[in-house]
Each structure stands twice: as C-alpha cells, then as structure tokens.
Amino acid sequence: MAKVDVISRVTVLAEQVISSLGMELVDLEYKREGREMVLRLFVDKEGGVNLDDCASVSRELSEVLDVEDVISEHYSLEVSSPGIDRPLKKVEDFQRFKGRLVKIRTFEPLPDDAGNKRKTFLGELKGIENGVVLVALKEGQNAAIPFEKVAKANLEFEF
C-alpha cells in the first residue's frame, strides 16, 4: 500500500479509536526515521492529555491496526500530546483557540491591513469568519488570512 494510502486509512481508524476515548486526533505523521518507520500521533482533549490517555490510545489503536493489517512493514507507534506549540490544522481550531497567541506561516506573502506583505504572522488569534483567519498582530496591525493560504499555524507560548 502506498504511503499516502496508509496515512489516509490509519487516519480514519485512529480518529474512530481516539474519539471513542473522548479525545481528538490533532496530527499524524508516518515517516522513516533511521532504519524504521514511525507512526506518530498527537492527541488532545479538553484540559489536556496525560500519560494514561496516551497509553490507552496506543493500546487500543495497536489492536485495531493489527487486525486491519494496514501497515505491512515494521513500524513504531508513538502517541503524545501536541505540546505547548500545538498545531492548528482544522477550521474549528482557529475558533477554539481564539484569544491565544499564534504564529501563522502562509504559502505566499500576504498583506496586513497596513499593506505590508509577509509570510509570517505573529499575534492574537481573533477567530475565523467565512474562511478567513483573523489575527491582531503584535506590531499593532491586523491580518485577514484566507484559510487555504495557511501553510502552518501553531499556538505560541507566552512567557
């Protein structure tokens, strides 16, 4: 099975298992590290996840993956929290984390409300409206970033 197909199939199975445990799948990676493949899942829930949550996901998902036989080669399964710099992947994430400090990178330079073009936006997430991510930038400007132009977005930790 091609890597893209493996990722797609594992994502469906993982979302079913993880949601049944009251958590959400934040991100999934399947890549070669050294000599072996690593399937890495990042999970979260309201209030955050702990070691027992990660162990439960690992146990449950391992059983499902063994039965479904999705991955034919040897791999390691890792389950963890997304960390303090949690990625924002879904439209819902941009609403859920409204008011938090975010760093957004875009595929191409986009203007802020002062006309300054940039690819990196750092500021307070104001939400998402009609597919446009709204950010109050640290420098005082505002930015309206079309969701489809977001290459990468993460929460930023404030000291």
From Swiss-Prot:
- InterPro entries in alphabetical order: Ribosome_maturation_RimP, RimP_C, RimP_C_sf, RimP_N, RimP_N_sf
Annotated GO biological processes are: ribosomal small subunit assembly; translation
Q: What is this protein called?
A: Ribosome maturation factor RimP
What species is this protein from? Answer: Geotalea uraniireducens (strain Rf4) (Geobacter uraniireducens)
Name where it's found.
Answer: Cytoplasm
Q: What is the top-level taxon of the source organism? A: Bacteria
Starting at the broadest rank, the lineage of the source organism is: Bacteria, Pseudomonadati, Thermodesulfobacteriota, Desulfuromonadia, Geobacterales
Write out the similarity annotation. Answer: Belongs to the RimP family.
Task: Decide whether keyword Ubl conjugation is in the record.
Answer: no
So where does this one cross the membrane? none
Q: Summarize the protein's role.
A: Required for maturation of 30S ribosomal subunits.
Gene3D superfamilies, alphabetized: Ribosome maturation factor RimP, C-terminal domain (2.30.30.180), RimP-like superfamily, N-terminal (3.30.300.70)
This chain is encoded by the gene named rimP
Q: Which GO terms describe its cellular component?
A: cytosol
| Record keywords, A-Z | Cytoplasm, Ribosome biogenesis
